Amino acid sequence: TIVSRGMAGGYTRFLPDEETHYRTPSMFKDQLVSALGGHAAEELIFGEASTGPSNDIEQVTRIARAMVTRWGMSDRLGPRTFGKTEEMVFLGREIAETRNYSEKIAEEIDDEVRRLIEEAQERARQMLRDKRDILEKLVNVLMEVETLEGETLTRLLSSDPKEPWPPTDLESKNQAPPPPAAEEQPRRP
């Protein structure tokens, strides 16, 4: 949505397609790319990014760091964990992290986190450059309806950018109706 919520100028929420407790590095990398989409779009359209995607950047940094330090998803550092996180179990949040590694390893962790984020940022930029016509179509639709969800958004993004969108009955609905069905993409296990 482009409707402001608190300090946020817009809002993106991802709901899982299916319940899964296991995530792969490629799933996390795709999530990084998606979260950096707003930042990359601002750079593409306005020439520089604003403070708008600051929460997205926090999220990306947190995920990339966890990939390296908690889940052993770094080719360079291998399947190891770094640091011990103290959690407040009843509140469900972390309160402190004990560092149990050297300054050299800390630098390698930072390098890996930076690499993951930079690769995701470049993927986001390239995707938006390649699909700029669809990006512009999405912007135009959001300016009219303010919020898009699930299947409608998926169909809009997979529609032909040259076809008119939205349909003429848009004014009578809160959200643009879905375009013709696109072929389903295979799902990851």
Regions found by a protein language model. Name each.
Residues 1-189:
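Soluble catalytic regions of large protease machineries
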